[in-house]
């Protein structure tokens, strides 16, 4: 894992950055709709010198902030902690922000789902959240191809749509964000229960219900809001 962390993953990141830049060169930038902007052109400032100056300025700004933090702050002073002892760890410890939704999936999975096959116990309380999480990530990655297949639209698009002008796509995105947000909040069910003096079981049940009905409600409300905004724009134009 150490060699993977310090060599392979950084190399993959560098390769992916190169692939990203090649895709930008091939497919060009997307841009907002406006006069003279189509799917076949790129309107804006050239790479040299405007964007190079911006990127260089941002780089040195971030570099300066990181250098200042490194020179003035003590981060993770392990020499003050002493030998590792897991016993003092508090019960309110929370997962890192990027892994919280997976922790929430484990917490919100109903217990008692274990299945025994040929003497081997399969912990469905772990397998179901794992499968659901992988399916969610797969759907997010596959959505552009699914929409392309459903709409039969094979053209390249480089002009950005306003969310209201693509109500179904926007509603699906809102449903996905709601699904992720409920799982992410589910990682803190214990803190929610203690801070609001509620029963942990009640919080878990409420989160489970929100996980099932929340995306549907978000889809319906978002789509109706987009259609209403479209009608409002039409009234203004007419």
Regions found by a protein language model. Name each.
Residues 1-238:
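Membrane-embedded and interfacial regions of multi-pass energy-transducing membrane proteins
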């Amino acid at each position: 894992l150490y060699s993977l962390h310090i060599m392979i993953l950084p190399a993959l990141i560098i390769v992916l950055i190169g692939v990203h830049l090649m895709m930008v060169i091939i497919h060009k930038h997307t841009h907002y709709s406006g006069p003279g902007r189509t799917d076949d052109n790129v309107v804006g400032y050239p790479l040299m010198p405007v964007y190079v100056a911006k990127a260089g300025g941002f780089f040195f700004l971030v570099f300066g902030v990181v250098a200042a933090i490194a020179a003035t702050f003590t981060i993770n002073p392990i020499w003050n902690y002493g030998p590792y002892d897991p016993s003092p760890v508090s019960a309110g410890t929370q997962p890192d922000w990027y892994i919280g939704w997976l922790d929430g999936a484990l917490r919100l999975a109903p217990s008692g789902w274990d299945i025994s096959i040929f003497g081997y116990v399969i912990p469905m309380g772990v397998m179901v959240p794992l499968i659901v999480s992988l399916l969610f990530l797969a759907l997010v990655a596959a959505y552009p191809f699914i929409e392309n297949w459903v709409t039969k639209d094979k053209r390249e698009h480089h002009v950005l749509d306003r969310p209201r002008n693509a109500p179904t796509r926007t509603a699906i995105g809102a449903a996905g964000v709601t699904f992720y947000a409920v799982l992410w909040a589910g990682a803190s069910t214990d803190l929610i229960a203690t801070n609001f003096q509620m029963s942990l079981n009640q919080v878990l049940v409420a989160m489970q219900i929100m996980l099932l009905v929340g995306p549907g409600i978000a889809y319906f409300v978002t789509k109706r809001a987009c259609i209403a905004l479209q009608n409002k724009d039409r009234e203004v134009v007419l």
